[in-house]
């Protein structure tokens, strides 16, 4: 089941949106964000909506709704589903007109709420990708823009062709940036490490939340330059992201790993946080 808020009303199903000559489809000026509803909570929904507005502005468009209004719209959509359903909440914006640059006065918007079960935390495998994340000099890396995901899709497709679920992507100078679909964490001797944000990947909202929760629980967390060798030699590797929240990595290249105590604590802390309030804030 899915509902979409378009043109001031909710529509059920999967309606067509973009015209044949739309700037969004032609030049790729589409931005979106993703939040989750599950078990009756919507953790960090306010932060996802605020990032959506920033992403729209970063691509030279104009969001027709303020962040607080997006929160209310999202919750309105969530209430159309049974409380126990796991949902994906996705605001999206694009420009209809413009040539190279979008015309901000023609910014279009849709907010989608769809049934989307959370992935089971069974673990995933990953290999090193031959594709790299772009730098801010060549792409709008500060925005959650659809144009970035063709590169992530190439990395994921390459990994699946080799028999892996996901890929570790490096930044332009060869340091680890993230997984193709989520932020990357590793643990070594009980200490947590994660690549420092350097404008080549999104400093994820779930990533920031997990860092704060782990530090609050007494863990030492270092945001630093991470090499692929660090990942290969880690005791634990796990991912954070809106779609799957906190998930363990069970194989890096040919090295098998077990979900460890740091991962387990991170997931436990995140679920406790998510249930701490109606929006997890």
Model feature map: region roles:
Residues 1-76, 94, 102-281:
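Helix-start/capping segments and mature chain N-termini
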Residues 81-83, 100, 255:
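An exposure/low-complexity boundary signal
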Residues 74, 83-93:
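Ordered, amphipathic secondary-structure segments that act as subunit-interaction surfaces
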